[in-house]
Amino acid sequence: TRQHSGNIVFVSSDDYRKYHPRYGELQAAYGDDAVLHTQKFAGKMTEALIDDLSAFGYHLIIEGTLRTTEVPLRTRDLLRSRGYDVSLNLILVRPEVSYLGTLKRYQQMKEIGLTPRMTPKEHHDLVARSIVDHLHTLYEQDAFPEIRVYNRAGECLYDRQKTPFRDPSELFREEFSRDLSHEEC
């Protein structure tokens, strides 16, 4: 933050679901499935914030799932048109560990009195399955000159600047297909 003079905003669509005009009503009616009914609203809020904040020159860290390639490409194009340097940074986590993390987050939010957000397993698994192919596509298209992959401990596992001829999606393929260690089970 120091190098950007505190001018950094973290944008995550999950943070905006609670501002849906019918959020309480949707929570009461659908419970854990309310997330499905606030998804479109949260996405529109995220796009509007990215548009407004980038117009004012804020540095942005945008959280996403890479469920598609269209959203990151559209965001990249908008930001580049406004003079931004854009990079793609990913955190490599096995699908099983990732889904367990969503369950833990749900429980923790419930325990501290926040409205928890349940991630449907089918949706989680769809995203986990598609991330490898979407990352491969973005790499092949040279869509982002800077791509980095980190583990949850913050260690950089891949940096396109250092290994430009290695497809980062291979890291995900390898990690997703290896046997779980005894400690992970």
PLM region descriptions:
Residues 1:
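Walker A/P-loop
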Residues 4, 82, 141-143:
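Short, structurally constrained coil/turn elements
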Residues 8-10, 88, 147-149:
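Conserved beta-strand scaffold positions in the cores of enzyme catalytic domains, especially
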Residues 17-20, 97, 154-157:
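A short acidic, often aromatic-flanked loop/helix-cap motif at beta-alpha or helix-coil junctions
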Residues 66-109:
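ATP-dependent NMP and nucleoside kinases share a basic, alpha-helical "lid"
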Residues 100-185:
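Conserved GTP-binding G-domain of TRAFAC-class P-loop NTPases and closely related GTPase folds
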